[in-house]
């Protein structure tokens, strides 16, 4: 099927898997031109030539409605400035029955993580408030998705959800 990876970042966690997915139709999107330059270099080094990389905003994606079978969002939702628009665009571009897979920081799980996020990572511009709690995310998902997996490890939430 067709997959969107947003934000792709540097693809440090996905490049080896993508290398083995020869027949997959994958589009990698990121707002940061610097990240795209890095991922293109990484893909070139790994001899990956069939994955599209695009610069764009998750809150205003150029894709048609119901374009993707899978949307992967690794370490993205805590970075996006407008979480509501990001969730809305992901929902809009995912086909019915398509899967939304994500992992990201959630507030209220580990005090040390909350302190680090608020005192350091947000000030450096790497994370963007407001931050959802796991319950906030569950409420967002339950309206439109069947939640297939929902796990918290430390201050990271990992989920897999199927669009109704």
Regions found by a protein language model. Give the residues of each.
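Short N-terminal helix/helix-N-cap motif within the alpha/beta-hydrolase-1
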Residues: 34, 81-85
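A short acidic, Gly/Pro-enriched loop at the edge of an enzyme's catalytic core
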Residues: 59-70
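A short SAM/SAH-binding and catalytic strip from SAM-dependent methyltransferases
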Residues: 70-82
């Amino acid at each position: 099927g067709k997959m969107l990876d947003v934000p792709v970042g540097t693809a440090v966690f996905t490049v080896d898997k993508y290398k083995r997915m020869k027949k997959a139709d994958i589009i990698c999107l990121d707002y940061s031109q610097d990240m795209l330059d890095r991922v293109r270099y990484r893909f070139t080094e790994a001899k990956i030539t069939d994955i599209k990389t695009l610069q764009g905003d998750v809150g205003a994606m150029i894709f048609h409605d119901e374009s993707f079978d899978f949307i992967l969002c690794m370490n993205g939702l805590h970075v996006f400035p407008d979480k509501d628009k990001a969730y809305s665009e992901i929902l809009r571009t995912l086909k019915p029955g398509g899967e939304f897979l994500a992992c990201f920081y959630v507030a209220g799980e580990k005090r040390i993580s909350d302190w680090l996020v608020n005192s350091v990572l947000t000030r450096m511009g790497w994370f963007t408030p407001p931050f959802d709690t796991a319950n906030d995310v569950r409420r967002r998902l339950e309206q439109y998705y069947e939640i297939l997996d929902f796990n918290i490890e430390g201050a990271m939430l990992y989920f897999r959800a199927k669009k109704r």
